């Protein structure tokens, strides 16, 4: 079963954790100095916040799958709809290793589709890079036209330097 994913950039982890813990009546499933994640079942959502990325607000949206088959189904659906799909393969971000790919909606909002393979002790295993002003985990590159695995090329605002 798929789980909806929302990742927000926040200015203060402490204030945001206090707010969202009260809102959800639940403590985060994962809490770090720069990141928190709630794995809620009602509604079924992976809600994450971090201080990495750009200005406060929506960093990216997405779908987390329970297995590789569901992830492949999402990718096939996007390709059949002629959407540009940027595949990352296996990537580390947000204290996890995942198989993932990205889409961008017509307004430029990044959509992550991923299957988490396991947790890691650091935000990312990439070489540290300066904070960027766009999606925290979106593929690293200057604002450009993505070369999709399938579908048509779409202008996707990407990080000049990914945070994870």
Question: Can you name each region flagged by the protein language model?
Answer:
Residues 1-15, 44, 61, 122-164:
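N-terminal beta-strand motif that seeds the catalytic metal site of vicinal oxygen chelate
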Residues 1-46:
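Core segments of cupin and vicinal oxygen chelate
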Residues 5-7, 37, 60-62, 100-102:
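Short aromatic/hydrophobic contact patches that present stacked aromatics
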Residues 13, 62-110, 118-121:
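Vicinal oxygen chelate
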Residues 27, 46-48, 84-89:
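A short linear hydrophobic-aromatic micro-motif
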Residues 32-35, 55-57, 94-99:
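Short acidic/glycine-enriched loop/turn segments that link adjacent beta-strands
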Residues 41-45, 54-56, 66-71:
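Short, charged/polar surface micro-motifs in flexible loops or helix N-caps
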């Amino acid at each position: 079963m798929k789980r909806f994913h929302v990742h927000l950039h926040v200015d203060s982890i402490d204030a945001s954790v206090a707010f969202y813990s009260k809102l959800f009546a639940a403590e985060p499933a994962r809490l770090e100095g720069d990141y928190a994640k709630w794995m809620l079942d009602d509604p079924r959502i992976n809600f994450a916040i971090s201080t990495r990325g750009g200005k406060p607000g929506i960093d990216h949206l997405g779908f987390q799958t329970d297995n590789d088959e569901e992830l492949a189904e999402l990718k096939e659906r996007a390709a059949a709809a002629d959407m540009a799909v940027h595949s990352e393969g296996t990537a580390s971000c947000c204290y996890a290793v995942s198989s993932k790919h990205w889409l961008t909606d017509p307004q430029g909002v990044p959509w992550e589709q991923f299957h988490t393979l396991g947790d890691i002790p650091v935000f990312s295993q990439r070489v540290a890079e300066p904070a960027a002003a766009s999606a925290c985990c979106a593929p690293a590159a200057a604002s450009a036209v993505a070369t999709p695995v399938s579908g048509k090329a779409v202008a996707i605002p990407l990080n000049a330097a990914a945070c994870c």
